[in-house]
């Protein structure tokens, strides 16, 4: 199943609307400022996923994975292999997310990884019975893809999970509210990775409010039209003072 960006946005909007009514009740549609998606509750209480932590790779390259049926995950490490049993509807996140001193630092990355795995499970439920059967003994690992890398069906599955995960973690409604509150609805200017002090401050407040990393926020904001990209040569920040 290959979906367009628009279709993925529609799925995310439907899921978050239903979850908000489930989780927040009557408060779901009250006038308010932007709020972070309670992704742990969405995973466990709404989707019924079992979330746990383990060492998933020797170099930290695997952030998380999820299983559609009982299976196993084999890790090759220092010339030997280690097997981790996986149960249906289980999400396994890398143990680095809960190590002392890293919980706060990696909070945004952990939340995005969990949203990514939730997206895999949501997309799996939309597949045909034939496709579900072919996927059931597989696990979906969290990796990063750009459009130019999409060569196989697995690549597309990963890209779609990234996009859907981002839309669930940062729903357009919450982004609109956050940008209105923290940036007065203006477009942020990205000069090849650098922002003016004013835009950088607005971006930082948005990230804190929604519980996401700067990298994830920039990608999402760009997609929703809240970031304009310009060459670094045009960069000018009136707040900066050069000695």
Predicted regions span which residues?
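Active-site hotspot residues in diverse enzymes, especially metal/ion-binding acidic/histidine motifs
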Residues: 1-243
């Amino acid at each position: 199943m290959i979906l367009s960006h628009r279709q993925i946005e529609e799925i995310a909007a439907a899921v978050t609307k239903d979850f908000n009514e489930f989780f927040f009740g009557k408060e779901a549609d009250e006038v308010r400022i932007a709020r972070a998606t309670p992704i742990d509750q969405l995973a466990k209480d709404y989707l019924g996923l079992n979330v746990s932590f383990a060492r998933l790779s020797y170099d930290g390259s695997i952030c998380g994975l999820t299983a559609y049926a009982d299976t196993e995950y084999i890790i090759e490490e220092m010339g030997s292999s280690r097997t981790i049993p996986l149960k249906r509807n289980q999400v396994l996140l890398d143990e680095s997310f809960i190590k002392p001193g890293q919980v706060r630092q990696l909070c945004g990355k952990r939340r995005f990884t969990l949203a990514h795995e939730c997206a895999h499970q949501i997309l799996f439920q939309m597949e045909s019975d034939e496709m579900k059967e072919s996927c059931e003994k597989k696990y979906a690992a969290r990796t990063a893809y750009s459009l130019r890398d999409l060569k196989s069906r697995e690549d597309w599955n990963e890209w779609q999970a990234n996009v859907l995960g981002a839309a669930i973690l940062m729903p357009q409604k919450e982004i609109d509210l956050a940008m209105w509150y923290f940036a007065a609805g203006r477009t942020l200017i990205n000069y090849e990775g650098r922002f003016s002090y004013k835009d950088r401050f607005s971006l930082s407040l948005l990230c804190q409010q929604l519980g996401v990393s700067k990298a994830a926020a920039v990608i999402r904001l760009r997609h929703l039209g809240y970031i304009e990209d310009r060459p670094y040569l045009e960069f000018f920040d009136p707040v900066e003072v050069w000695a």
